[in-house]
């Protein structure tokens, strides 16, 4: 197995998920950071940066969920989920829904030209925590965290 062999890159049993997952995590966390900073500094430009980061993060969750399910099917041949893998799958789905919810709140208020609601900030903070916990569980599955 050669690290630059295209077949190795494209057809490794779970490599795509491991590579793709970092994009929505990073985009979401920095989007929430920009939103909190924009709220604190009252700068519209930061709110715009937050919106676009959250938008791309929401879009990026789709291939991540698909590759996660494919990795489960290929790597474990569709075995019954249990333990950390089950928690990771459930938390991954919850994380994806929360990322999309946060983006939807921003998109709706942007489209209707309203001020962003204050209730979004605790939702965003909780979502960052859930995303981080999901990533932590994924690290255990990949062997990075233990």
Enumerate the language-model features and the residues they cover.
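Polytopic transmembrane helical bundles with strong interfacial aromatic enrichment
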Residues: 1-146
């Amino acid at each position: 197995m050669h690290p630059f062999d295209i077949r190795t890159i494209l057809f490794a049993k779970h490599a795509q998920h491991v590579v793709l997952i970092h994009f929505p995590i990073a985009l979401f966390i920095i989007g929430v950071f920009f939103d909190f900073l924009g709220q604190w500094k009252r700068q519209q430009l930061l709110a715009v940066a937050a919106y676009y980061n959250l938008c791309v993060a929401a879009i990026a969750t789709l291939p991540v969920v698909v590759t996660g399910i494919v990795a489960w099917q290929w790597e474990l041949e569709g075995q019954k989920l249990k333990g950390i893998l089950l928690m990771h799958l459930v938390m991954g789905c919850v994380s994806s829904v929360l990322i999309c919810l946060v983006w939807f709140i921003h998109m709706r208020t942007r489209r209707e030209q309203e001020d962003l609601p204050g209730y979004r900030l605790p939702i965003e903070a909780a979502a960052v925590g859930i995303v981080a916990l999901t990533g932590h569980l994924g690290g255990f599955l990949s062997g990075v965290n233990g």
